[in-house]
């Protein structure tokens, strides 16, 4: 972790948005489709969710997801990072993992983890069976935003920024 504060940093640009994806253990879940998963959540199925740390985008995602489903905040288990969360989802420590695709792609490809709902409007080619929240009529889009920053006070004229990325600053 950095000891820098926001006041000590200057943004350079956004790198990417990684949509939040709700994933389940393929072998241990009763949900075989995104529709079954959403129906179960709306019906009040008691599920334990996992994410990275407390107070992060994962934690906020679980809260907002439950709220959109008309449910109270479920049990949330914080893990040290996405890799640990994906491993613990496979092990059965949680019922649902709030992950980005890059954090669990190997487990998805192995058939251990099944992505259910992409909290975005755009489908993702590597996970064609997952549905977007928008496709399912759920107005909830959340992503991990990744970007670049430098120390505040750096003369930005010394940093080459290509024209296509300049509007992102």
Where are these regions (language model features)?
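Beta->alpha turn/N-cap motifs
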Residues: 1, 81-82, 99-104, 119-121, ...
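Hinge/capping helix and adjacent helix->loop/strand transition within the periplasmic-binding protein
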Residues: 2-84, 133, 138, 143-162, ...
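Short, well-ordered beta-strand segments
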Residues: 48-50, 97, 116
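Short helices/loops that flank or line small-molecule/ion binding pockets
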Residues: 39-41, 64, 68, 83-97, ...
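Extracytoplasmic "Venus flytrap"/periplasmic binding protein-like
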Residues: 1-4, 106-118
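Short, charged, surface-exposed secondary-structure boundary motifs
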Residues: 125-129
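Conserved helix-loop-beta element of the AMP-binding
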Residues: 10, 37, 112-124
